[in-house]
């Protein structure tokens, strides 16, 4: 577990960043990584090795950032699993935005002249809400919850086929830019989205002993069934993949596979 019940001098654990010329400091409340009573330095070294052998560094960061600094909550394994899945969701959204930008790159030249931001309050509020959270005693928990609202809106916009593509592109470009500007200050979303997604998928494929050769074969058979309009067989194959821990998402852009467990309440990773 991560315990924050030890009083560590603030000069050892405060974190500072500068935003628009103002300095903000985060005090994790004596947060150390420790399974048993130990000194701050020993705990940090010991537990960092244990946690980072299981989880990406940004998962650890998100777990701490999501923990109220004034609270007495102790972070346990289930918190890391939840943060890993939330971070996966964030990176999936960022990757979907990048894919949409690539698919509509021909519209880029029109953005400056004809592009319109669909929800200015959401897009322009990203930086404003972040600064407000920092002014609220460096409330990183609030900042993360605001990120979640923006990502939910981004996914809704991506899935809205009735919205003007140029305005969607203009809006999503600005969301991507603003989110990275503030999130990078907290040390998250530093990876290339596609790289992070592949790393987490590979981890869960190994954890669940998923035979990807068999999965690929089933997906090809399903595609053939769909092409032949044999939808009953297509649904049967989809159900079989689900039993193997693979979910299939069909959209206007085709079919995409993902790891079922990443969208469920997870088990402990031992």
Language model regions located:
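Active-site and channel-lining beta-strand-loop segments
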Residues: 1-43, 248
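Structural preference for alpha-helix termini/caps and helix-kink/transition segments
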Residues: 30, 37-270
């Amino acid at each position: 577990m991560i315990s924050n019940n030890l009083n560590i001098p603030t000069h050892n654990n405060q974190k500072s960043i500068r935003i628009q010329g103002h300095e903000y400091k985060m005090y994790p409340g004596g947060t150390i990584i420790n399974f048993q009573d130990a000194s701050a330095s020993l705990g940090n070294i010991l537990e960092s090795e244990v946690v980072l052998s299981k989880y990406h560094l940004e998962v650890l960061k998100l777990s701490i950032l999501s923990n109220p600094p004034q609270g007495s909550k102790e972070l346990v394994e289930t918190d890391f699993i939840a943060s890993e899945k939330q971070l996966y969701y964030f990176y999936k959204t960022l990757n979907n935005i990048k894919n949409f930008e690539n698919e509509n790159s021909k519209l880029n030249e029109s953005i400056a002249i004809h592009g319109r931001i669909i929800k200015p309050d959401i897009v322009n509020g990203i930086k404003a809400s972040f600064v407000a959270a920092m002014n609220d005693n460096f409330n990183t928990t609030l900042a993360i919850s605001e990120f979640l609202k923006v990502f939910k809106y981004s996914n809704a916009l991506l899935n809205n086929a009735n919205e003007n593509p140029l305005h969607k592109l203009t809006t999503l470009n600005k969301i991507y830019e603003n989110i990275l500007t503030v999130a990078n200050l907290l040390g998250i979303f530093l990876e290339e989205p596609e790289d992070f997604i592949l790393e987490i998928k590979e981890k869960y494929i190994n954890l669940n002993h998923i035979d990807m050769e068999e999965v690929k074969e089933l997906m090809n058979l399903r595609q053939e069934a769909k092409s032949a309009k044999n939808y009953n067989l297509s649904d049967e194959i989809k159900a079989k993949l689900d039993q193997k821990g693979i979910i299939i998402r069909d959209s206007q852009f085709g079919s995409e596979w993902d790891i079922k467990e990443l969208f469920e309440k997870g088990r402990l990773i031992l």
